[in-house]
């Protein structure tokens, strides 16, 4: 049964909002997935805080253009599903892991904070550690010089105190 114009407009509006709200969207060809595998993928994406949508390519293209994304049309061929996420790494990582496991899907492209990226860049994104790990590494890199500086000051202060103590003992011995 064909969908009505109102239903199409609702789908376009929903996809447009998702393209605008999500920091990342990954487009994948889901050809060959059976229902059980699709359900498993949706569950994994949901656990990672992502959403998985399937819509007609023409509606997806219209929604992308309305959201200000030009140039997505060449990737909208064949059965395409979109994984939306707030964490820039999560959808790419979940899809890449799932593809390695099942060998049934193919990443076509992605949208990262309003910029269209190709499949290679999406795979590179999937190889990044999660945001929290990256922040911890940056913070650790910033703290290391401070700890070194504090240690150097502590050592200098300790030597100064030992010198004062030696002078005090020497003066006490002379008196």
UniProtKB/Swiss-Prot annotation:
Gene expressing this chain: rplJ
Similarity field: Belongs to the universal ribosomal protein uL10 family.
Protein name per the record: Large ribosomal subunit protein uL10
Protein task: Forms part of the ribosomal stalk, playing a central role in the interaction of the ribosome with GTP-bound translation factors.
GO BP term, pick one: translation
Organism: Pelotomaculum thermopropionicum (strain DSM 13744 / JCM 10971 / SI)
GO molecular function (one): structural constituent of ribosome
Quaternary state and interactors: Part of the ribosomal stalk of the 50S ribosomal subunit. The N-terminus interacts with L11 and the large rRNA to form the base of the stalk. The C-terminus forms an elongated spine to which L12 dimers bind in a sequential fashion forming a multimeric L10(L12)X complex.
Protein keywords: Ribonucleoprotein, Ribosomal protein, RNA-binding, rRNA-binding
Classification lineage: Bacteria, Bacillati, Bacillota, Clostridia, Eubacteriales
HAMAP family: Ribosomal_uL10 (MF_00362)
NCBIfam families, per the entry: PRK00099.1-1
GO terms for cellular component: large ribosomal subunit
């Amino acid at each position: 049964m064909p969908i009505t114009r109102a239903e199409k407009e609702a789908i376009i509006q929903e996809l447009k909002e998702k393209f605008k709200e999500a920091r990342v969207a990954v487009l994948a060809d889901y050809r060959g997935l059976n229902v059980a595998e699709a359900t498993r993928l949706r569950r994994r994406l949901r656990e990672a805080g992502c959403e998985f949508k399937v819509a007609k390519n023409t509606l997806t293209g219209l929604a992308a253009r309305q959201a200000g994304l030009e140039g997505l049309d060449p990737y909208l061929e064949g059965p395409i599903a979109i994984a939306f996420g707030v964490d820039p790494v999560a959808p790419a990582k979940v899809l890449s892991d799932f593809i390695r496991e099942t060998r049934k899907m193919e990443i076509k492209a992605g949208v990262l904070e309003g910029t269209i990226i190709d499949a290679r860049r999406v795979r590179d994104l999937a190889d990044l550690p999660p945001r929290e790990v990256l922040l911890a590494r940056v913070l650790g890199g910033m703290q290391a010089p401070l700890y070194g500086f504090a240690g150097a000051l502590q050592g200098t202060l300790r030597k100064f105190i030992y010198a004062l103590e030696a002078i005090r003992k020497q003066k006490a011995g002379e008196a």
